[in-house]
């Protein structure tokens, strides 16, 4: 697709940027509640560890199936309509889910598929619209500042929000906290009306045409390498869920979950600052080698399970994630500019999302089957293998930097 529409005035541009930034920050809080803490809540409404693992697997599987379906239905529609309404639809659906939790939170185990599917549809619509809106609303001159400020806000929330939400749930109830989150959802929808957008002229979406262009493009090997890396990365998605499950099985407390998450976020932010300040693309081989070793900490949980093992594993994986995620995100779209395919960015995003969707669904189906089997040894095996996927991604990035970036600053 081609972005034909530009904001006419700096005042309008500024208003849309601020509203989009606020909405995205509020999304971080809502997502934390509907992922980490909703998964923790399933623990409190489920009898038995095996049933808990099964229900989490069902929730995540239904969610990511719905994400894939909604994303691929909405991606072409986004190009044919005013995409801000798809964005607001995503926010409204998520608000409905939170309100659903307010009234039916204690019976969540009986309606787990509905909750997962509704969350997935909302997230799929959000993915299909947010990236397009951001690219359209934020001018090229403002993009770096927008991303930098957005990152600062997100990292700050990742430190403060978990321990606040966890504490509130423990001193009140999950449904009570859901009311507060519902208010945040309503505020988010109101703020979204400050974002101005319209359907660009001559905007198209043709996935088949993009794949045909890619076959003959000189940069195809670099782009395909990124796609292969995302196969391994897609399998790592399950790790965040498994970390939450481990903490709840070990501590059984939302406050503990929030405190551990906040501490890890704080440590991760410091590591990310050092990473950004002292490393450069093409000269990070040593760092990727060190980071590839960290997921081996999962072996402590597998063979020497204890409170300390869980905490060490959480810290190691937090450090690995905070370096891996932004690095891979940089390489995700950077090659398109070099290849002259940036007008096909939505089609490219669809390929990446399809790869990750398949890997995520496979991972959570395995988790569901493990829960049904009642064999916790298999849970530990899945924990170890999915954690080692981070090592595979880091090794792939190491090869990428050695092969393509050693003497070249472009990504």
Residue ranges and their predicted role:
Residues 79-91, 279-294:
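Cytoplasmic membrane-interface "Motif A"-like loop-to-helix N-cap segments
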Residues 176-194, 380-397:
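Symmetry-related core transmembrane helices of the 12-TM Major Facilitator Superfamily/SLC fold
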Residues 70-83, 169, 270-283:
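Helix-to-loop junctions at the C-terminal end of transmembrane segments
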Residues 92-107, 293-306:
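C-terminal ends and interior cores of transmembrane alpha-helices
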Residues 3-65, 220-262:
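Helix-loop boundary and gating motifs at the non-cytosolic
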């Amino acid at each position: 697709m081609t972005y034909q529409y530009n904001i006419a005035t700096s005042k309008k541009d500024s208003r849309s940027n601020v509203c989009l930034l606020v909405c995205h920050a509020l999304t971080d809080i809502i997502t934390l509640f509907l992922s980490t803490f909703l998964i923790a809540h399933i623990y409190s409404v489920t009898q038995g560890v095996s049933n808990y693992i099964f229900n989490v697997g069902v929730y995540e599987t239904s969610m990511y199936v719905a994400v894939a379906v909604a994303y691929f239905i909405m991606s072409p529609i986004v190009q044919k309509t005013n995409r801000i309404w798809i964005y607001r639809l995503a926010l409204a659906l998520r608000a409905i889910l939170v309100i659903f939790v307010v009234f039916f939170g204690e019976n969540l185990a009986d309606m787990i598929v509905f909750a997962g599917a509704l969350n997935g549809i909302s997230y799929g619509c959000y993915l299909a619209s947010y990236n397009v809106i951001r690219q359209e609303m934020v001018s090229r001159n403002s993009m770096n500042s927008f991303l930098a400020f957005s990152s600062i806000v997100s990292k700050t929330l990742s430190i403060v929000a978990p321990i606040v939400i966890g504490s509130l749930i423990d001193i009140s109830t999950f449904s009570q906290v859901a009311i507060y989150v519902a208010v945040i959802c309503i505020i988010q929808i109101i703020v979204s009306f400050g974002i101005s957008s319209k359907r660009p002229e001559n905007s198209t979406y043709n996935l088949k045409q993009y794949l045909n262009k890619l076959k003959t493009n000189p940069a195809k090997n670099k782009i395909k390498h990124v796609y292969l890396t995302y196969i391994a990365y897609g399998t790592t998605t399950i790790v965040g869920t498994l970390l939450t499950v481990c903490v709840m099985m070990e501590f059984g407390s939302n406050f503990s979950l929030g405190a551990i998450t906040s501490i890890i976020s704080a440590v991760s932010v410091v590591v990310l600052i050092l990473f950004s300040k002292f490393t450069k693309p093409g000269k990070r081989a040593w760092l990727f080698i060190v980071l590839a070793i960290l997921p081996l900490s999962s072996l402590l949980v597998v063979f020497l399970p204890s409170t300390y093992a869980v905490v060490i594993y959480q810290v190691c994986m937090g450090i690995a994630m905070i370096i891996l995620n932004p690095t891979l995100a940089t390489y995700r779209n950077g090659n398109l500019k070099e290849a002259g395919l940036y007008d096909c960015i939505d089609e490219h995003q669809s390929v990446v999302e399809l790869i990750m969707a398949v890997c995520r669904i496979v991972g959570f189906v395995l988790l569901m089957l493990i829960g049904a089997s009642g064999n916790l040894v298999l849970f530990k095996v899945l924990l170890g293998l999915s954690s080692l996927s981070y090592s595979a991604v880091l090794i792939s990035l190491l090869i990428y930097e050695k092969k393509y970036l050693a003497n070249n600053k472009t990504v």
